[in-house]
């Protein structure tokens, strides 16, 4: 069961890295090792290459996942295909984890990120966001027999979250008393919650 919490997340958005050019790397000339320069492709570069490189999830249905035939599917992928079509190019996908979305966007490893990416102040200081294309709320999923209806019920329970998500940030900041078990991938979160004697 999905329980909406009072803390509603801003919006899942398209991260637009093509325009992101300032603030990457060290500006201090005394640094012995400067951060490598990020390489961002312009729309003209993308059109000339014939492909738009898009960071998506590969394990978070219905947003981004790989189907039984090995093809990327989901809402974010559908949106990516439309963007590529509008540019007259093919979509090329790079599988991301929640914790590496900012890195891939700000270093130019992908042209854009379409991976269920909520706008936060901290993220907006590092990457540029376009307008939202969906809204979500933070929630908790629990077995029917242990229906969670309030945060107080999470005391002495183990809450599973994906690293680099707003769920992780929210609980770390607002509810440090809740024990978190953090995984890199949503697949691992799901596997750990499969029927077992765990909470």
Language-model regions, residue ranges each:
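Extracytoplasmic small-molecule ligand-binding "clamshell" domains
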Residues: 35-116
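Bacterial lipoprotein signal-peptidase II cleavage site
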Residues: 21-33
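Flexible hinge/capping segments at coil-to-helix
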Residues: 142-159
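Bacterial N-terminal signal peptides
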Residues: 10-19
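Ligand-binding cleft/hinge of the Venus flytrap
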Residues: 66-68, 80-89, 167-185
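Bacterial N-terminal signal peptides that target proteins for export
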Residues: 1-9
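Conserved small/polar residues in nucleotide/adenosyl-binding loops
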Residues: 192-199
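Ligand-binding "clamshell"
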Residues: 121-132, 136, 176-177
């Amino acid at each position: 069961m999905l329980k909406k919490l009072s803390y509603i997340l801003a919006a899942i958005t398209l991260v637009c890295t093509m325009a992101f050019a300032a603030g990457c790397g060290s500006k201090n000339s005394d640094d012995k090792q400067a951060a490598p320069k990020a390489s961002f492709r312009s729309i003209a570069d993308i059109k000339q290459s014939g492909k738009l490189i898009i960071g998506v999830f590969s394990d978070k249905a219905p947003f981004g996942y790989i189907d039984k035939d090995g093809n990327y599917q989901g809402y974010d992928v559908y949106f990516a295909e439309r963007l590529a079509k509008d540019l007259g190019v093919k979509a090329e996908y790079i599988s991301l984890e929640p914790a590496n979305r900012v890195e891939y966007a700000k270093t130019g490893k992908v042209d854009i990120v379409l991976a269920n990416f909520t706008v936060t102040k901290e993220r907006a200081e590092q990457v540029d966001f376009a307008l939202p294309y969906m809204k979500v709320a933070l929630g908790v999923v629990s077995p029917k027999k242990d229906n969670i209806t309030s945060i107080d019920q999470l005391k002495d329970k183990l809450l599973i979250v994906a690293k680099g998500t707003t769920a992780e940030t929210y609980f770390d900041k607002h509810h440090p008393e809740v024990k978190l078990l953090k995984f890199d991938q949503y697949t691992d979160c799901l596997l750990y919650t499969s029927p077992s004697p765990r909470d």
